[in-house]
Each structure stands twice: as structure tokens, then as C-alpha cells.
UniProtKB/Swiss-Prot annotation:
This is Ribulose bisphosphate carboxylase small subunit, chloroplastic 4. It comes from the Eukaryota. Its main location: plastid. Heterohexadecamer of 8 large and 8 small subunits. GO terms for cellular component: chloroplast.
Amino acid sequence: MASSMMASTAAAVARAGPAQTNMVPFNACRSSVPFPATRKANNDLSTLPSNGGRVSCMQVWPPEGLKKFETLSYLPPLSVEDLAKEVDYLLRNDWVPCIEFSKEGFVYRENHASPGYYDGRYWTMWKLPMFGCTDASQVIAEVEEAKKAYPEYFVRIIGFDNKRQVQCISFIAYKPT
């Protein structure tokens, strides 16, 4: 009993003492040291950083007439070999390839001003997801089959991670002419 009385009085004494230095109130990330008062004496503008004249070769993408769609749309059209490399990357990451197609290759709204199900965000899936696919040539063959069945439609390949339940990659495999 005496030992418990001693512990409670010691705790009361510890609480009554002044605040510790690490218990001061938060001071909103202010530094106690002011910024240096010295300024750069040189007002010469030639010392400013430069991108080395690369501005003259930069181009602005035209906002009309050349729509961009998916991940790789700023590249030139992908050849069959390029598509196979992308599908190999998709398969190496253990993603499930899926093929989708749509008449319109971009988001549009024709029925209502607010977003909805029929505004181009969801494409029609070509057959079923290719679970267990291990060869890029199988995916390319399905893309070719979709192109033959719907030559005026856009065809895209998506990579779905079935462990995390997310779509990880999506790119246009075929654009109609």
C-alpha cells in the first residue's frame, strides 16, 4: 500500500512541474533565423537560367482536328511489332489483356450535359478478358479479328490487374481511317 501511495504522489509532482522544452506549442513552421539580408549585387539578366535555346524547336499541339486518345497517342501509329512489345510489357506485369471497341474514340455527351453511362467513357468489350494469356500473338490476333468485324470502330487494349482490381494501362491499337 505504501508503494502505491508513493507512486501516485510522484506522478502528481511530475505533473505540477514546468513544461518541458519539447512540449512548447507548435509555431506554424516559422524559422527563428531570418532570411539573409544580402542581395545579389549583379542586376545582369544574362545570369538567369536558360533552357539553351530549345524553345525554338518546341511545338504546340493544335487544339482542333488532331484528337488525342489514350496513353500512347502522342506517338506515331504503332506497328504490329510495337503493339506486340506493349502487350509483352502488359503480360510481364501479370496484367490481364482485354480488348474493347467503340464507334467514338473519345468522350462525348449527346443526351445530357452531366456525365453519364452513355457518354463514351465505357467501351464495348470484345469477347471476354484474356485470363491466362501468355503470348502477345494471341492478343494481336484478337485485335485483327476485331478490326475485321468492325473496321469503322476504334479498338483499344487495356491491361487489368486482377489482384488490385484496377486498370493499369490502356492504349489505342487501331484507329479507323
